[in-house]
């Protein structure tokens, strides 16, 4: 394949879909991953289009990740960019947390990222302009009373990505972390916040443009971490 290949892990209606379309617009062939293949098919109008391949993958399962990546290599080629957008925003506290939910949060945010990055590493090292972009959240910086599972997993993810960056930057692989500080506009969040106007939300298309710019940075001025929020967000 002549086009560079980008894997977007964790594609749904919001920023995952916007990231796929933004990188398609920039000339990438996009591998869109989700556990639910029917949702991907609905989003993209099919599981294989000219510039997008939708593939089912359970990012909490190492075997599923390895099988998916082998299929990508056999059918499409070697990717040069990973955008890891998987996660699950749980609301729980020490009073009601389920240890299984806590473990699943870690698997999606940390184990899945590690497994997929390890699969891709040999191909990234031989690629032109290789990168790993991980989508985080404010929960990576601090916990709240009701985000025990989510904040513990996200803070572990952020530390892991820092470690990855310190290893891989000298080898020419740009690893970066994006902290999302706000509510992304989707049909679900719009229904959940019916009294909020557009200024309350982060718009997925605008977010995707900011994130995609990370893979265009010159090596002399790489950013590791950026935070993105709407202008009215209280921070």
Sequence positions of predicted segments:
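Active-site loop of short-chain dehydrogenase/reductase
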Residues: 3-4, 78-79, 93, 124-137, ...
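Conserved glycine-rich cofactor-binding loop
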Residues: 12-14
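Conserved glycine-rich Rossmann-like NAD(P)H-binding loop of the short-chain dehydrogenase/reductase
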Residues: 26-42
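Rossmann-fold cofactor-recognition segment
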Residues: 47-63
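Substrate-binding pocket helix/loop in short-chain dehydrogenase/reductase
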Residues: 93-94, 98-106
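Catalytic loop of short-chain dehydrogenase/reductase
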Residues: 131-156, 161-162, 166-169
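C-terminal helical subdomain
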Residues: 170-173, 177-179, 193-235
């Amino acid at each position: 394949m002549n086009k560079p290949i980008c894997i977007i892990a964790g594609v749904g209606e919001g920023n995952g879909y916007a990231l796929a379309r933004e990188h398609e617009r920039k000339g990438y062939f996009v591998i869109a991953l989700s556990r639910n293949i029917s949702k991907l098919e609905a989003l993209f109008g099919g599981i294989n289009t000219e510039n997008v391949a939708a593939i089912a993958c359970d990012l909490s399962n190492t075997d599923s990740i390895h099988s998916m990546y082998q299929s990508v290599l056999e059918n499409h080629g070697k990717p040069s960019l990973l955008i890891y957008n998987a996660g699950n925003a749980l609301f729980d506290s020490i009073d009601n947390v389920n240890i299984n939910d806590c473990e699943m949060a870690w698997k999606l945010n940390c184990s899945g990222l590690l497994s997929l990055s390890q699969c891709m590493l040999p191909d990234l090292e031989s690629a032109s302009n290789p990168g790993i972009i991980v989508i985080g959240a404010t929960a990576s910086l601090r916990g709240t009373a009701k985000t025990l599972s989510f904040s513990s997993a996200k803070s572990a993810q952020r530390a892991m990505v820092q470690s990855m960056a310190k290893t891989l930057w000298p080898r020419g692989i740009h690893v970066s972390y994006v902290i999302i500080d706000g509510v992304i506009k989707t049909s679900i969040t719009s229904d959940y916040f019916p009294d909020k106007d557009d200024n309350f939300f982060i718009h997925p298309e605008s977010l995707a443009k900011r994130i995609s710019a990370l893979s265009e940075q010159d090596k002399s001025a790489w950013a590791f971490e950026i935070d993105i929020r709407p202008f009215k967000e209280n921070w």
